[in-house]
């Protein structure tokens, strides 16, 4: 039990209807802005000195950006993810081409969908890339950078690409 189906969960229907209606209304613009931000972020990271994958193909055609932080299977991606987390930035350690060990990958997988959802644009992607560089390239104390991360985020509290967005504070706590 419950196997593949536990019940109808009718209380989920209303939320799904609203989410799908919002996606129908705003999904195209949201997807466009995510890709534009991901490409701007990748370009800004490369300008800061990061090894961003797929430069010859425009870095990305999705919400994801991949960066390499050391030799294959070196664990540099794991270390980078932990340092960024200490600075209040959540990323995803990720195996990259050539890596063979899931627990010691060389890369990070970075997404911009949440940053886009709260209204950040291409200019903010440059600011975020600078925060990454301070931690990972310039070895600045993550606890110092964390204050600047919180300050940047404090200007972006409203959920976008949804109905009644002027009244939706996504981060009240």
What residue spans do the PLM features occupy?
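Generic non-transmembrane alpha-helical segments
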Residues: 40, 44-48, 79-87, 135-138
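Conserved strand-to-helix beginnings and helix N-cap segments that scaffold or border functional pockets
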Residues: 28-31, 78, 122
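PLP-dependent enzyme catalytic core of the Aspartate aminotransferase-like
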Residues: 36, 102-173
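Short, well-ordered loop/turn and helix-capping segments at boundaries between secondary-structure elements
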Residues: 2, 22, 71, 86-90, ...
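Short alpha-helical basic/polar micro-motif
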Residues: 32, 82, 126
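Active-site C-terminal subdomain of aminotransferase-like
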Residues: 1-72, 145, 152
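Conserved PLP-binding catalytic core of the aspartate aminotransferase-like
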Residues: 52-119, 167-173
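Proline-rich low-complexity regions
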Residues: 2, 96-97, 157
């Amino acid at each position: 039990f419950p196997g593949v189906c536990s019940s109808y969960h009718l209380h989920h229907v209303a939320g799904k209807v609203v989410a799908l209606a919002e996606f129908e209304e705003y999904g195209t613009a949201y997807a466009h802005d995510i890709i534009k931000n991901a490409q701007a972020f990748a370009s800004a990271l490369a300008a800061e000195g990061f090894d961003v994958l797929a430069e010859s193909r425009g870095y990305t055609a999705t919400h994801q950006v991949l960066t390499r932080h050391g030799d294959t299977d070196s664990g540099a991606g794991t270390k980078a993810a932990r340092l960024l987390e200490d600075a209040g930035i959540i990323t995803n350690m990720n195996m990259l081409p050539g890596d063979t060990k899931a627990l010691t990958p060389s890369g990070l997988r970075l997404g911009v969908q949440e940053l886009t959802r709260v209204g950040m644009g291409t200019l903010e992607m440059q600011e975020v890339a600078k925060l990454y560089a301070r931690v990972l390239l310039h070895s600045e104390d993550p606890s110092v950078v964390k204050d600047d991360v919180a300050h940047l985020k404090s200007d972006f509290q409203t959920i976008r690409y949804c109905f009644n967005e002027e009244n939706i504070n996504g981060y009240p706590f």
